[in-house]
């Protein structure tokens, strides 16, 4: 059920939960629709990822989903298509406090992202709070002085180069957590479409341990319940355990198959695939 707006609109409860080591269970949103987002908001997840990298989301569709989630006790996380300074500025002005930025391969990239998410003098974020939903259009009097501290920056490491630089990336001040992307990582390691390959699995486990050892929050997406629980046991603190598109597709196929004859069902088996997506 919808909840009253939190007393402190600037407090990033998701960031504070990660800092406290409290596991946060999430769901990926790829349907790019506020109605679906609101359904998922009431399901009981700690966070929902609005995906702008692989789903057909833009700034306006992201805004609509943020508005749909606002009345619920769930933390929105937004993944932009790329770590572009200008796009990040727009998302932050919409009220996004937690960003998951894909394809971060070097500590230099990570430092640039920290700069993009902070107001001067700590960063280079442009100031336009009178136009920003984030400040409630200047109705939050201390927004400009507190905004930097409440931003949660999560960077996504998903390549061989990223793994090589993982320790340096995790050490960047202002990076709150590092997310391992199994699908792209498997491709980079030479196992396209096979994130469960032993080489990939070993690389993921090693990466999660290194992130935790660096004192940063470790995250991952796995629709395999056994694997998701395994990653939590390894110390991952923000774990997405499903994708809305997959949930809908599987439920629709299962329902249709239950009314079809056996030969049709055998001729059209449930797609398995190797990707967590």
From Swiss-Prot:
EC number: 4.1.2.-
Annotated protein name in UniProt: Hydroxypyruvate/pyruvate aldolase
Active site: 54
Highest taxon, organism lineage: Bacteria
Keyword Nucleotide-binding (UniProt): no
Cofactor(s) annotated in UniProt: a divalent metal cation
Lineage summary: Bacteria, Thermotogati, Deinococcota, Deinococci, Deinococcales
Key words of the record: Lyase, Metal-binding, Pyruvate
Organism name: Deinococcus radiodurans (strain ATCC 13939 / DSM 20539 / JCM 16871 / CCUG 27074 / LMG 4051 / NBRC 15346 / NCIMB 9279 / VKM B-1422 / R1)
Positions marked as site (Increases basicity of active site His): 93
Primary role: Aldolase which can catalyze in vitro the aldolisation reaction between hydroxypyruvate (HPA) or pyruvate (PA) and D-glyceraldehyde (D-GA). The condensation of hydroxypyruvate and D-glyceraldehyde produces (3R,4S,5R)-3,4,5,6-tetrahydroxy-2-oxohexanoate as the major product, 2-dehydro-D-gluconate and 2-dehydro-D-galactonate. The condensation of pyruvate and D-glyceraldehyde produces 2-dehydro-3-deoxy-L-galactonate as the major product.
């Amino acid at each position: 059920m919808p909840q009253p707006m939190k007393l402190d609109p600037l407090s990033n409860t998701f960031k504070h939960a990660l800092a406290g080591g409290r596991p946060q269970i999430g769901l990926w949103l790829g349907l790019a629709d506020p109605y679906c987002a609101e359904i998922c908001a009431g399901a009981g997840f700690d966070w929902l990822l609005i995906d702008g990298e692989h789903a057909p989301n833009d700034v306006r569709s992201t805004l609509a989903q943020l508005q749909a989630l606002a009345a619920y006790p769930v933390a929105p996380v937004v993944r932009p298509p790329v770590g572009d300074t200008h796009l990040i500025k727009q998302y932050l002005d919409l009220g996004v406090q937690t960003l998951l930025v894909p394809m971060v391969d070097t500590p230099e990239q990570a430092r640039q992202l920290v700069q993009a998410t902070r107001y001067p003098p700590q960063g280079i974020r442009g100031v336009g709070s009178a136009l920003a939903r984030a400040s409630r259009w200047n109705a939050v009097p201390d927004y400009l002085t507190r905004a930097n501290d409440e931003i949660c920056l999560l960077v996504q490491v998903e390549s061989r180069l990223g793994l090589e630089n993982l320790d340096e990336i995790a050490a960047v001040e202002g990076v709150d957590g590092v997310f391992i992307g199994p699908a792209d990582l498997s491709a980079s390691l030479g196992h396209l479409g096979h994130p469960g390959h032993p080489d990939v699995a070993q690389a993921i486990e090693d990466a999660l341990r290194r992130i935790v050892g660096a004192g940063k929050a470790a995250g991952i997406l796995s629709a395999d319940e056994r694997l998701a629980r395994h990653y939590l046991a390894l110390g991952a603190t923000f774990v997405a355990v499903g994708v809305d598109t997959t949930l809908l597709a599987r439920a629709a196929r299962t329902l249709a198959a239950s009314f079809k004859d056996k030969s049709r069902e055998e001729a059209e088996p449930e797609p398995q695939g190797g990707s967590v997506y």
